[in-house]
Amino acid sequence: MEGRKRIAVVGSDARQAAAGRALARAGYAVAGAEQVARADVILLPLPLDESRTPLAQLLRAAKPGAFALGGRLSAQAVEIARQAGVELADYFARPELAVYNAIPTAEGCIGILLQQRTRTLWGAEVLVLGFGPVGQALAVRLSALGAGVTVCARRPEQRALAESLGLRAAPLTALAGLAPAFDTVVNTIPAPVLGDGVLARLRSGSLIVD
């Protein structure tokens, strides 16, 4: 028992609970945040909400040589870890995790669309902004459900990929001109791209998921 790595899982959302169960099945000694001082590894949530997770307090309590992992880490979090003498790694920087994480994000978005729309997704005209992992996962699933999907993306290679998958594609600079053709718009770009000019050109009653 003493030879097993101790992992403190911080946070209680479904993902942290699932991670804790998987680690326990793999043979690690898993505990909650109250055992941070004894942990070899500290598993922080994704995203790391520093307003809810007392990061400085947690890491100051960690033992020397402890290793912490978190997702979407801010510069402030990295500095707190440095001051506490704890090595901190961002697991969301791993490309494969971003791809896998896009799947539940896309499914959650489709769930919102099904709840909020008064008509089927089959036959709908949906504009997807961005074609990173989330945009890709979402667009192909919407197309499989029978929606007409147009991808608006900045990079030419993203638009080429969208077209190779049987989707329509356009540059972001064409967004304002495209807007009137759609009753559903989903922004997967982590930045505000739907300005007042674009919003004014959308159909009345359009559904926007941002």
Language-model region placement:
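Residues in the short beta-alpha loop(s) of Rossmann-like NAD(P)-binding domains
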Residues: D13, S74, R154-R155
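NAD(P)-binding Rossmann-fold cofactor-contacting core
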Residues: A26-Q35, L145-L165
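Glycine-rich adenosine-cofactor-binding loop
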Residues: A8-A18, L23, W122-S143
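Hydrophobic anchor at the start of a short beta-strand
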Residues: I7, A29-V30, L88, V149, ...
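Short, structured coil segments at secondary-structure junctions
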Residues: R25-A26, P64, Q83-V86, L145, ...
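Alpha-helical segments flanking ligand/cofactor-binding loops in enzyme cores
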Residues: R21, L59-R60, E79, V140, ...
